Regions:
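Conserved nucleotide-binding/hydrolysis micro-motifs of P-loop NTPases
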Residues: 183-184, 225-229, 246-251
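N-terminal nucleic-acid engagement/recognition segments and initiation subdomains in replication
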Residues: 1-106, 312-324, 335-401
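Conserved catalytic/switch belt of AAA+ P-loop NTPases
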Residues: 190-212
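Conserved alpha/beta core segments of nucleic-acid transaction machinery
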Residues: 272-323
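AAA+/SF3 P-loop NTPase mechanochemical coupling elements
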Residues: 167-172, 206-223
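P-loop NTPase catalytic core of nucleic-acid-dependent motor ATPases
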Residues: 67-176, 241, 270
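Conserved AAA+/SF3 P-loop NTPase catalytic/coupling segment centered on the Walker-B
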Residues: 176-197, 230-236
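A short helix-turn-beta junction within AAA+ P-loop NTPase domains corresponding to the substrate/partner-engaging
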Residues: 232-250
Length: 401
């Protein structure tokens, strides 16, 4: 069917490639703007030979995020980052405030800082936000949908498989990459996620196209019903902010729509709010501020069986003999493990001590006091003096693991 002048489609030329701009219908209503590679000859057939000269031309693509002073074109380069159409306006936002308080709890001000940084400093690196709960109806998905409503097309919902795919052009230039049911419990998944959260540039790859390196500023928000092992997190890891989310007290089916109507007031507040924190790390927040019990639970779940056995054994010795420190060499702990019916090799023990617990032995062979099994004693352990390059671990260190 022929189109009238008012119905003419939009075209652009980027470099030497012609694109048609279309609105692709979404399953749940609305549209998403897409660029489809077009053909010069087809354009001439539809609109005549002179129409091509009127098509806007750009030298290439760029990705420059900005929510306040957005520029669709930067120095003759078409900005792939999309504007958000909210107009900040002073007002109240009680429903948004209640959601942020529910998600961040006692860390409410940190949560507000996180959202403010997303809005005003979109290129700032931020921790991987992981929301966990075994319960249903906790508001985790509502929070993800709220982020999507605020930042619109700059938020993409990924699946676990998307992280493993070599093709990433759909999400590499986004502000937020969110996953509603994350389960990335393979070591290579965890390493990729950590690397993406801190990298400054990334190679974009699409099917049938050459790889292209772009600046990477995406932040990750993950949700999981698995409180113990949604991702692999090692001891000392500072890139995760894990929040345990409680069940909602009520279920309001119109809650998301109420959130959407408050977004202009919320953005106005973020523009004028004073930050509660200052930049203290590459991911803004001091790691100590983000160390939660939910994070410790995941770290403990990631430990191997030998580490757990050593941890429990040494704490048992401390409790039994009434001490807060324990010194030992490899042979001491191996003998104690044998008495506990635990088989272990010296290299396995070394790995736990040096890689997992970050302990270093004494620089020289010195006299130290350790403990060995003695079933004739009430406490089951007796002190013994030995000489060697021993390790020392404290109760505080063990309880922080």
């Amino acid at each position: 069917m022929a189109k009238t002048k008012n119905e003419k489609e939009e075209f652009i030329r980027v470099g030497t490639t012609l694109y048609k701009l279309v609105n692709q219908p979404r399953l749940n209503g609305g549209y998403v703007k897409k660029r489809i590679v077009w053909n010069n000859e087809t354009l001439r057939q539809d609109y005549g030979k002179d129409y091509l000269a009127t098509v806007p031309k750009y030298d290439g693509f760029c990705t420059v995020p900005d929510h306040v002073d957005y520029r669709p074109v930067v120095d003759k380069f078409l900005n792939l980052y999309e504007s958000i159409d909210h107009q900040p306006k002073e007002g109240d936002f009680p429903h948004i405030q209640s959601l942020v308080r529910h998600i961040f709890g006692e860390q409410y001000e940190l949560g507000m800082d996180y959202l403010q940084l997303l809005y005003l400093q979109p290129v700032q690196k931020l921790p991987i936000l992981l929301l966990v709960s075994e319960e249903r109806n906790t508001g985790k998905s509502t929070f993800l949908n709220f982020l999507k409503a605020v930042f619109q097309n700059n938020v993409t919902f990924n699946t676990n498989e998307d992280f493993r795919s070599q093709f990433n052009s759909d999400w590499a230039g986004k502000l937020l990459i969110v996953v509603d049911e994350v389960l990335l419990n393979r070591r290579e998944d965890s390493e990729r996620l950590k690397n993406l959260s801190t990298t400054l540039s990334y190679k974009v790859e699409a099917k049938g196209k050459d790889r292209d390196e772009i600046a990477f500023f995406a932040k990750f928000v993950l949700c999981s019903n698995n409180e113990y092992l949604p991702v692999i997190i090692d001891i000392g890891e500072t890139r995760y902010w894990v929040r345990k989310i409680d069940r909602l007290q009520s279920d309001d089916t119109d809650f998301l729509q109420k959130l959407k109507t408050e977004i202009p007031a919320f953005l106005y507040h973020l523009q004028h709010r004073t930050m509660a924190t200052k930049k203290e790390s590459r991911m803004w927040f001091a790691p100590s501020l983000l160390h939660t019990e939910a994070l410790r639970k995941i770290i403990r779940s990631n430990r191997n069986r030998l580490e757990i056995e050593m941890h429990e054994l040494i704490l048992d010795i401390m409790e039994s003999v009434g001490t807060d420190t324990f010194s030992f060499c490899y042979n001491d702990i191996l003998l104690l493990l044998v008495h506990s019916q635990v088989k272990a090799e010296k290299h396995q023990v070394r790995k736990v001590l040096q890689e997992c617990w970050k302990l270093t032995p004494a620089s020289n062979g010195l006299t130290y006091t350790t403990y060995q099994f003695n079933y004739n004693r009430e406490c089951r352990y007796e002190p013994i003096k030995r000489v060697g390059r021993f390790y020392t671990v404290t109760r505080e260190q063990l309880e922080s693991l």
